[in-house]
C-alpha cells in the first residue's frame, strides 16, 4: 500500500512542476480522489482562489494554514488504521501468557486426575502452553513489525507532502 502511495506523491510532484500553472494542474486533477496529496492540494487551491483579492502576505498565510490543517487531517485518517496493529502488538503476548497458564493448569489437572506424573500425562498440557505462547509472540512480533513499517512509510509520505507544501507556498 505505502509503496504505491509514496510513488504517487513523487508522480504528483513531477506533474505539478511540469504544469503550466497551479490552476491548470488543479483543473487536471480528478474531482473525487482519495489520494491525500490531491485532497490537500485541492483545498489549498480553493483557498488560494478564494483569497485572490487579498494581499499576498494574507493569502500566503491563509493558504499555509489550510495546508497545515489539511495535512494534519489526512495524516490522522491514515494513522487511525494503526490502532489495530498497536493493540495486537501490545496485547498478543498477554493472550499467549494466558494460554500458557491455561496449558499448565491442564497439566496439573491431568496429574491430579491420574495421580501419575509421567511425561505422557504432563506433555499435552505443556505442549498446549508452549503453542499458545508461540502464537501470542508470533502475532505480537508481526503486528509490531507491520506497525513500524507502516508508521515509517507514513512519516516519509507526509514529510514529502510537507516539503511540497513549503515549496508551493514559496511560489504563490
Locate the predicted segments by residue.
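Predominantly long cytosolic amphipathic alpha-helical stalk/bundle segments
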Residues: 6-98, 106-118, 145-172
Amino acid at each position: 500500500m505505502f509503496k504505491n502511495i509514496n510513488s504517487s506523491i513523487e508522480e504528483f510532484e513531477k506533474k505539478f512542476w511540469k504544469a503550466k500553472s497551479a490552476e491548470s494542474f488543479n483543473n487536471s486533477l480528478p474531482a473525487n480522489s482519495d489520494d491525500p496529496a490531491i485532497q490537500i492540494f485541492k483545498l489549498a487551491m480553493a483557498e488560494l482562489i478564494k483569497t485572490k483579492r487579498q494581499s499576498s502576505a494574507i493569502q500566503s498565510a491563509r493558504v499555509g494554514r489550510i495546508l497545515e490543517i489539511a495535512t494534519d487531517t489526512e495524516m490522522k485518517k491514515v494513522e487511525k488504521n494503526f490502532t489495530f496493529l498497536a493493540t495486537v502488538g501490545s496485547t498478543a503476548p498477554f493472550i499467549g501468557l494466558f494460554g500458557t497458564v491455561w496449558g499448565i493448569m491442564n497439566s496439573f489437572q491431568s496429574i491430579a486426575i491420574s495421580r501419575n506424573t509421567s511425561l505422557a500425562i504432563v506433555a499435552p498440557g505443556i505442549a498446549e502452553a508452549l503453542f499458545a505462547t508461540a502464537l501470542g509472540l508470533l502475532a505480537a512480533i508481526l503486528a509490531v513489525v507491520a506497525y513500524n513499517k507502516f508508521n515509517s512509510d507514513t512519516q516519509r509520505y507526509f514529510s514529502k507532502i510537507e516539503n511540497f507544501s513549503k515549496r508551493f507556498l514559496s511560489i504563490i
